[in-house]
């Protein structure tokens, strides 16, 4: 214990010592100014969005928190945890909801991957290419899908230029991590040629098996128990994208083409596996100013994705190949104010073909299923003095057409209304109520085969009903001056909540599976609270933050929901000026004992942990070029960390102590 205290004291000293450079207030304030939430229909800043609680990561904050997956990057944000199946596959969990209930977007369009099906599937968007990541809840989520009852995450990488750069701009980054001997290189560049905007970006990442504090399995007698290093935790990725736009006074039209390749290992309970992923994506984005009388602008987006991944037993034997071919279109009209109301109306269509073929000649894990969706939506906002009202609605028709099974159709209606009272300048009290409906996915309806990475035999139910969520969210927030704070409480009641009930394998015995996972339904309730206090985040000098969040999810008459986040408390502090930024953060997660009933899950309690991270950034300026040298430290105490939200927590701990060193340049 004394060793840990001394280590922590030394870390604090290293994080803040020697910082004596005179602050250049205007430059720092400009670089730390609140950024616009691109997924918000009204283009609000993060601090202005009390009705739709939001968090935006960008700039150095994003680069310092950047992980190998989306869940790893966002897992310490307020109200957000991570599924953490492996270093290559981890999705964000928002207020206890995950999978298809959390929509993942790239530049406002669906990623087109299959990460919502299962926790072992990666998000189809490279983290190293992201320039901004937005977490959004509330009425704005209705623009992107009725199923996003938990919220949405939008990954922004600016691949289609929307403005003409007067000179070439860009950035590049090189980093090395000690825990896995990992290397990462990313770059992006923009320039213009006349009225043509040009963009290119790419990244390469290669990480080996990562070191762990002790043994991988809680039960040391496990046949796949590793000590000191976790086998099959390697992670490789490469990503390249090109984009171009015609930009004129009337607006713009542009397109981008990208290719993502990713190979990552999965260290399971009784099996080792590898996933080999490839995704090709083509996007079109256009905006026309004042297209008709009474309208401010028309935005049209098109996206086509060809996604596939192969699951390999023991890293060599192909077993199942998942694929998804998807096309999406979005049409948004922004109208001029009508009787003080401002807003958007739009249309969204989605077409996809999903299948999971068993390469050993057995029945498909998921049969070839064609899904179609057509939706209309509207979001409106108006100020009445100190009171702001926000309303939205979405009406959607969804069909699932499987090969050799029952076709299902669903009519969905989702509504949201909120009010914000600015009772004192800089303070706001907000309340939002919403009803949202979600259609079961093809996997929930029609699965019928083994899934080796999760060691389950998945069994769908073609008679599942649509989910209906009723959510209430109350927020209180202070958004000005040095001390800022916010607090939220929420309740979400979900009728016909779809979940996978685990039981000892019967149908899966012949395939060597540990469990049968049967998709079924029950009513569920999720409640929680979040609070955060920050000091001086937008000015030079000392800054700090403390926060806490908690969520409780239950199935009516069946006990706790499985794999729920535990209560967390955290603090961070540091110093910043125009050249230096240093910080130290501590996150404590309580022991998790509110586990699911053994009749629906084999869940076990999770031990408490304390994670300590630190960072130092130093900026050198050469004309219009900035060079930032950085040193990041993660899990400084080399704590054994297991997440209550991870299906493999008893077999796959988080990485041990890790130092990341690198540099990035912006020009």
Where do the language-model regions lie?
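Short acidic/polar hinge/loop motifs at secondary-structure boundaries
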Residues: 110-139
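Periplasmic-side early beta-strands and strand-to-turn transitions of outer-membrane beta-barrels
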Residues: 167-173, 177-180, 184-277
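C-terminal beta-signal and adjacent terminal beta-strands/loops
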Residues: 208, 213, 437, 495, ...
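N-terminal periplasmic accessory domains that precede
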Residues: 70-73, 90-93, 102-105, 120-126, ...
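Gram-negative outer-membrane beta-barrel transporters
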Residues: 343, 383-389, 482-486, 490-494, ...
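N-terminal periplasmic "start-of-domain" segments of outer-membrane beta-barrel proteins
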Residues: 33-65, 99
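Flexible loop and strand-edge segments within Gram-negative outer membrane beta-barrel domains
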Residues: 233-235, 250-298, 304-326, 361-364, ...
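Outer-membrane beta-barrel signature, preferentially recognizing the C-terminal barrel domain
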Residues: 272-291, 322, 407-408, 414-418, ...
């Amino acid at each position: 214990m004394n060793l840990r205290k001394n280590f922590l004291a030394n870390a604090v000293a290293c994080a803040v010592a020697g910082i004596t450079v005179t602050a250049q207030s205007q430059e720092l304030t400009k670089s730390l100014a609140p950024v616009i939430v691109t997924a918000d229909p009204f283009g609000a800043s993060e601090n202005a969005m009390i009705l739709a609680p939001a968090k935006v990561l960008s700039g150095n904050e994003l680069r310092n928190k950047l992980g190998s997956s989306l869940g790893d990057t966002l897992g310490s944000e307020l109200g957000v945890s991570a599924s953490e199946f492996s270093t290559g596959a981890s999705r964000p969990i928002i207020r206890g909801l995950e999978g298809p209930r959390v929509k993942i977007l790239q530049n406002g369009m669906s990623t087109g991957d299959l990460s919502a099906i299962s926790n072992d599937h990666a998000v189809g968007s490279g983290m190293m290419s992201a320039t901004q990541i937005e977490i959004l809840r509330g009425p704005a989520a209705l623009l992107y899908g009725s199923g996003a009852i938990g919220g949405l995450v939008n990954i922004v990488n600016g691949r289609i230029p929307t403005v003409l750069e007067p000179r070439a701009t860009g950035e590049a980054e090189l980093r090395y991590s000690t825990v896995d001997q990992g290397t990462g290189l990313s770059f992006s560049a923009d320039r213009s040629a006349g009225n043509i905007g040009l963009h290119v970006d790419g990244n390469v990442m290669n990480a080996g098996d990562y070191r762990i504090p002790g043994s991988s399995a809680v039960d040391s007698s496990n046949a796949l128990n590793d000590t000191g290093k976790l086998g099959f935790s390697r992670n490789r990725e490469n990503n390249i994208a090109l984009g171009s736009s015609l930009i004129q006074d009337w607006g713009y039209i542009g397109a981008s083409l990208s290719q993502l390749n990713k190979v990552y290992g999965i260290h399971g309970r009784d099996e080792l596996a590898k996933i080999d992923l490839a995704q090709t994506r083509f996007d079109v984005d256009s905006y026309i100013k004042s297209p008709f009388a009474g309208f401010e602008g028309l935005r049209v987006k098109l996206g086509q994705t060809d996604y596939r991944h192969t699951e390999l037993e023991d890293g060599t034997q192909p077993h199942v190949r998942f694929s998804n071919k998807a096309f999406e279109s979005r049409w948004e009209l922004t109208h001029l104010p009508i009787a003080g109301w401002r807003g958007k109306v739009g249309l969204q269509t989605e077409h996809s073909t999903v299948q999971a073929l068993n390469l050993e000649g057995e029945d498909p894990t998921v049969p070839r299923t064609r899904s179609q969706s057509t939706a209309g939506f509207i979001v409106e906002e108006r100020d009445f003095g100190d009171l702001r009202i926000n309303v939205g609605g979405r009406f959607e028709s969804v069909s699932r057409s499987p090969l050799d099974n029952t076709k299902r159709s669903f009519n969905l209606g989702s509504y949201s209304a909120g009010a914000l009272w600015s009772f004192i300048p800089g303070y706001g009290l907000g309340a939002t109520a919403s009803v949202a409906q979600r259609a079961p996915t093809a996997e929930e309806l029609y699965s019928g085969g083994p899934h080796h990475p999760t060691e389950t035999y998945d069994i769908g139910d073609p008679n599942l009903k649509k989910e209906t969520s009723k959510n209430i969210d109350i927020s209180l927030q202070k958004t000005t001056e040095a001390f800022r704070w916010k607090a939220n409480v929420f309740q979400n009641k979900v009728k016909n909540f779809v979940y996978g009930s685990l039981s000892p394998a019967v149908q899966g015995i012949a395939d060597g599976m540990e469990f049968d996972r049967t998709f079924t339904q029950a009513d569920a309730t999720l409640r929680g609270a979040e609070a955060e206090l920050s000091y001086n985040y937008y000015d030079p000098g000392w800054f700090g933050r403390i926060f806490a969040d908690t969520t409780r999810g239950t199935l009516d008459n069946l006990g706790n929901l499985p794999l729920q986040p535990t209560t967390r408390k955290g603090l961070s502090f540091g110093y910043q000026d125009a050249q230096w930024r240093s910080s130290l953060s501590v996150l404590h997660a309580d022991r998790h004992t509110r586990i699911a009933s053994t009749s629906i899950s084999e869940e076990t309690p999770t031990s408490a942990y304390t994670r300590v991270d630190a960072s130092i950034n130093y900026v050198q300026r050469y004309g219009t070029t900035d060079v930032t040298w950085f040193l990041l430290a993660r899990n400084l105490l080399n704590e054994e960390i297991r997440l209550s939200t991870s299906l493999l927590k008893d077999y796959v701990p988080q990485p041990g102590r890790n130092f990341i060193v690198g540099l990035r340049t912006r020009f």
